[in-house]
Amino acid sequence: MLVVLLILHAVSCAHSHGSPGAAVPVKQCPSACQCEEDGILLLVDCSEQGLSSVPTDLSPLTSYLDLSMNNISEIQPNAFRNLHFLSELRLSGNHLRHIPGPMLQGLYNLKVLMLQNNQLERLPSEDPWELPNLLSLRLDANLIMEVPARTLSGMRSLRHLWLDDNALTEIPVSALNDLSSLQAMTLALNRITLIPDYAFRNLSNLVVLHLHNNMIRTLGQNCFEGLHSLETLELNFNDLQEFPVAIRTLAKLQELGFHNNNIKAIPERAFVGNPLLQTIHFYENPIQFVGRSAFQFLPKLHTLSLNGATEIREFPDLKGTTSLQVLTLTRAGLTSLPYDLCHLLPKLKVLELSHNVIEELPSFYHCTSLQEIGLQHNLIKQIEMNTFQQLGSLRSLDLSWNSINSIHPDAFFSLQSLIKLDLTGNRLSNLPMTGLTSLTHLKLKGNMALSRSFGLEDFPNIRVIEMPYAYQCCVFGGCSSYRSASQWEEQMGSEEEDFQKKSPSLFPIHTDNNYDLDLEEFQLAIEESKLQTSIQCTPIPGPFKPCDNLFDSWVVRLGMWLISLVSLMGNSLLILTVFTSPSYLSPVKFIIGTISGANLLTGLCTGTLALVDARTFGEFALHGAQWEMGAGCRAVGFLSVLASEGSILFLTLAAVQCSVSVSCARAYGKSPSLGSVRAAAVACLALSLAVAALPLIGVGEYGATPLCMPSPLPDGEPSTLGFMVALIMMNSLCFLVITGTYIKLYWDLMKGDFDSIWDCAMIKHVAWLIFTNCLLYCPVAFLTFSSLLSLFPVSEEVVKSVVLVLLPLPASINPLLYLLFNPHFREDMRLLLSRAHLNHDRNLDSFVSVDTEKSSYDSTQALVSFATEADGVFESLSVPNPETVARFTCPPSVALIPCQMQMKPSTDRENTGENLIRSAPGLIAKEQEHIRSSGVDTQNGTSIFSGAYHSTGPSAHSQVFT
């Protein structure tokens, strides 16, 4: 009751001293604010109202006033004169540049003053703020460059001072001398370069001091003198060149952070004056030397972090530091661990030794409290039976990115609490299953030799699993219930973020003082119950990683068999007739044969895939990994690319050869020789071999999919993506060259200014090849290119079907075009059958007499004489050479097909040559009949005739037939 009377008396006095017109009701709330009563006092919230000045109608009973996030740039001198009960004033987030001392007069009960996030450049020096009961002052995030000596002299009760994120260049030593009650201060995020001696000599009650994110290079030897109560010191993110030996005077120091500096050495007995140290964060320093006694005899130390000390080769001596619970020594140069590690650190819970060069592990038998071990990115090759024995509390074990090729069958036998195991990126071919039944998280990605199948019975509690192959996820429901890629990536992204935070990371680096593994696991369990309702297994099976069958549908399956059979039979027959026929092998005909050879390889690869599909029908997941990683898949991929590129390059050569032949015949009267065409074909073959060999040396990958071709999907390796794009661009360029070349060829033929007679069968055949191959390649190139670059959504099913059917389809169509529509095939077959029949007759009539042989000799001589005479006649005429005539007039069924629509007027000599050509078949036929009737060896006769034919050279071919 007495307190209430005193308050009312004070209020009445305040009104009596004011002008009558300015009287304010006791509990009136400003119109732009929200008020709440706190007993007889008033809490006023005027934040974020766009105010440009302090409201004038504030109640004198206001105890809390929030004016933050407004547009106030200046405060009137008497704005708070009557607010004697004000205990908290918030002016943050305004545009204040200066606050004079008189503005805060009379606020004797003010305990909290917030002025952060303004534009304060200077503090009052002549008229200091008289705030005797102020406990907390926030001046952070301003533009303060200096704190005058008398500014803080009226705040003798101040306990918390924020001066971070300003423009200070030195410690305000004089201003701090009057703050003997100060308990916490931050000077972080300034431009301080030096801490002088005795900078904090009167701050005997200071417990927390933050000096991080400055430019401090030098510390005075006695700079921390007087800080008898200091427990937390932050010197992180500075430019310290030497270890801060001045910390030895801080007898009560418990938490020390000076990571991200430029300190190169930790001296012997570095922390001898800090026996109560509990946490040391010293990572991201270029440490080259650590004294053996540096971390000895720190019985309270429970967290030690030395990340990034790349020059450390030996494990630090931790004798007497028996309370250590979290030890982090990552990105150092450790080559081994002491065998008595667990005797030295019996309470160790978290051991993080990633990114070192450790090759062998000691036994962790006596580290019974260990809950997390991180040994990723080392050189460990094998895990012995006793390495992790009796670690009943171990929950997380990270052995990823080592060279582990062997794990003892009982290595995990006693790990009953193990729930997370990471073996990513090793060389395992087998995984022991004993002791892994409690796992909820398992990572085996990157162990490409580990192709065995796993079952649900192997991991009954599994929730998240990463396998080397997508086929191994089929048993975990990957085919039926896998989520979309975006949803999976979202969760994986959240897991990566959580790696840096407190919740479900696989192997976090702990920096907090009060680390609680049980709390983390509890949080992890809650998150998993929310996010996961089924087993999440990656990589996710799909059309290019099928679970049941290599081919998704019977249409594709039957189509592949049909393409394979037609290609194998058709191309074999074509090659047989082209290269074994006794008829003249023209350059274009030779190229047609090489194209058929490439198509035969394509048919062989297609048939191999069809056989694999038949062999693994209904259970491809059991064999998919072995097929992908096997030599057979790589061979199929190599031959597929070789055949595909060879076919396109040979087709390009055929188009160019036809065009060049026409041009050369018009200009020089002859076409390129068969030898030059063969050399060009060898060059095309060499280029195809080089392209097909690139994935074998790491540019692309043949085993990325069970189709054994470089993956046409955008989620492949960058090298594979680049290889596929380059392949499509090169093939598209070839088809452009082919199209342009043949347009020019037809333009030249339409002019009709050639003296020679051309056989258009081959020219038309090459044109049909160009049309069909280009027509079939366009959708393949378009869909593959769109899929690789994600130009628009293309389902994997469509891409797979197109690649399987349309890509090898030309290999079956090309030979059919030749076998069904090209007259040269029929003639070559007739010659082959005739020769076979004659060979059979020769075997029956092998008892020829000497007289018969003589008559045969005479006939042969007559035939040679005829050929010689024909040579003389044709050399004097502008008509085709006689041997070419003989070759193509022997079969009377082959017709001369002129390409040009009109010919030049024939001369008498041309008519004479034409008559001779027309009479040649009769002469040769009569001679052959004479030979046959005389019982002469027809094969020898053919050979002699061929010799006579070749005596004049193949150049005549360019003037008559292709």
Curated annotation (Swiss-Prot):
Task: Describe the function of this protein.
Answer: Receptor for R-spondins that potentiates the canonical Wnt signaling pathway. Upon binding to R-spondins (rspo1, rspo2, rspo3 or rspo4), associates with phosphorylated lrp6 and frizzled receptors that are activated by extracellular Wnt receptors, triggering the canonical Wnt signaling pathway to increase expression of target genes. In contrast to classical G-protein coupled receptors, does not activate heterotrimeric G-proteins to transduce the signal.
- Domain LRRNT: start-end pairs: 20-60
Q: Which UniProt keywords apply?
A: Cell membrane, Disulfide bond, G-protein coupled receptor, Glycoprotein, Leucine-rich repeat, Membrane, Phosphoprotein, Receptor, Repeat, Signal, Transducer, Transmembrane, Transmembrane helix
Keyword Transmembrane recorded: yes
Which cysteine-cysteine pairs are annotated as disulfide bonds in the entry? C633-C708
Which segments carry the LRR repeats? 38-58, 59-82, 83-106, 107-131, 133-154, 155-178, 179-202, 203-226, 228-250, 251-273, 275-297, 298-321, 322-344, 345-368, 370-390, 391-414, 416-438
Q: What is the lineage of its organism?
A: Eukaryota, Metazoa, Chordata, Craniata, Vertebrata
The terms under GO molecular function for this entry are: G protein-coupled peptide receptor activity; protein-hormone receptor activity
In which broad location class does this protein mainly occur, judging by the first location in its UniProt entry?
membrane
**What biological-process GO terms show up in the record?**
adenylate cyclase-activating G protein-coupled receptor signaling pathway; hormone-mediated signaling pathway
Q: Which residues are glycosylated?
A: N71, N202
Transmembrane regions: 559-579, 590-610, 647-669, 679-699, 723-743, 766-786, 801-821
- State the compartments where it is located: Cell membrane
| InterPro entries referenced in this protein's UniProt entry, alphabetically | GPCR_Rhodpsn (IPR000276), GPCR_Rhodpsn_7TM (IPR017452), Gphrmn_rcpt_fam (IPR002131), Leu-rich_rpt (IPR001611), Leu-rich_rpt_typical-subtyp (IPR003591), LRR_dom_sf (IPR032675), LRRNT (IPR000372)
Membrane protein topology class: Multi-pass membrane protein
SUPFAM superfamilies recorded: Family A G protein-coupled receptor-like, L domain-like
Q: What is this protein called?
A: Leucine-rich repeat-containing G-protein coupled receptor 6
What does UniProt give as the signal peptide span? 1-16
Any one GO CC term of this protein is:
plasma membrane
Keyword Nucleotidyltransferase assigned to the entry: answer is no
Name the protein family.
Belongs to the G-protein coupled receptor 1 family.
